[in-house]
Amino acid sequence: MTYIRKGTPVFRKITFAFFAAGFNTFAILYCVQPLMEEFTREFHVTPTAASLSLSVTTMLLAVSMLVFGSLSEVWGRKPIMGISMLAASVLCLASAFSPSFHTLLVLRTIQGVALAGLPSIAMAYLGEEIEPGSLGSAMGLYISGNAIGAVFGRIVSGLLSEYLNWHMAMGTIGVISLIASVIFFINLPPSRHFTPRKLKLGKLGMSLIGHLRDRKLFSLFLIGFLLLGSNVALFNYIVYVLLGPPYSLNKAFSSWIFIVMIVGIFSSSFIGRMVDRYGYPKILVMNIFIVIAGALFTINNMLAVKILGIALFTFGFFGGHSVASSWVGRRALHNKAQASSLYLFFYYAGSSVFGTIGGLFWSGFHWLGVVGMITFMLLVALWLSGYLARSVKMPDKRNEKGLN
């Protein structure tokens, strides 16, 4: 059967649809990040407790993706993704009317379940429909949508909460996400290479175990766990740094700091093309080095250097995620949706775990403690990427370009 090639009209429709989907997912997910300081003040909770407004969502997102990834092998890709996006948008609107922090946490928890239907399947859809030589570019554009959504959600919610309130901020994100959901459903064509299977829990369980026993796949899962964990820890607590002395920025100005995440748009697309040309291993190692350098730059007290560090960190993060996620789609020969779901389970579990643990380092050691935790995590990720790079040089019947 014919796979979709870069430059064709259907390739452009698919990448536009997934760009909108990535935008939607990350705008909803991260719109609470600049609001955490306001949650701390309005609901009288600690910064660690306020971080749960993101952590509970990502944890349920991680767990639910294992279910949706398996169900999509039976029910198909597009229907689950479309329903998921619509439900998440409605729940975002409902969250805007939360009368208490507990209500907000309950709605954000349910939202995590709803959001899971898209990212758990997106990589499998792209891996099935896009030709291998164009997959890196397609995945890069999808993750570019993630970057824009993350920037948009953070900046818009921060600005609106400064001049109006956080209820209006989340309500606005909910309305915009509904529009993005419609764009996605209209533009995405049905799967052409998907073959439905009967739901056999025993076989699904064995397939999950098989993916986990694959050392190279498991290394990629752990890299995703560490990458997003470090990213969320940095952005959860950098807000407290910027709002406090010696900077004492107002919330509106500090929200604009998130504009540096726009480099993720260029990084994921650019790195996707680099992968198509040079293979996965070298590009993954390069990106993790960039993330480490960016984290260390944020220790400097000069605001300009700190912002440069955030920009470098973001460039490397989105590039590294683009490489690791598309590598999983190439490495898994069977049950690709399950493999993608496992990667994203670890990815978002890292967000939940380290997004909250970072609060303990913040409380005990302030920003230097948070950066120390992040640096240690990234050194482990670098070691894992080095293992993957070395494994490519060994004979491997699955080896194509880099590591299949």
Curated annotation (Swiss-Prot):
**Subcellular compartments:** Cell membrane
> Which residue spans traverse the membrane?
16-36, 49-69, 79-99, 110-130, 133-153, 166-186, 221-241, 252-272, 283-303, 307-327, 342-362, 364-384
Annotated GO MF terms: transmembrane transporter activity
Supply one GO CC term from the record. plasma membrane
Chief location category: membrane
**Name of the protein this chain belongs to:** Uncharacterized MFS-type transporter YybF
Topologically, how does it sit relative to the membrane?
Answer: Multi-pass membrane protein
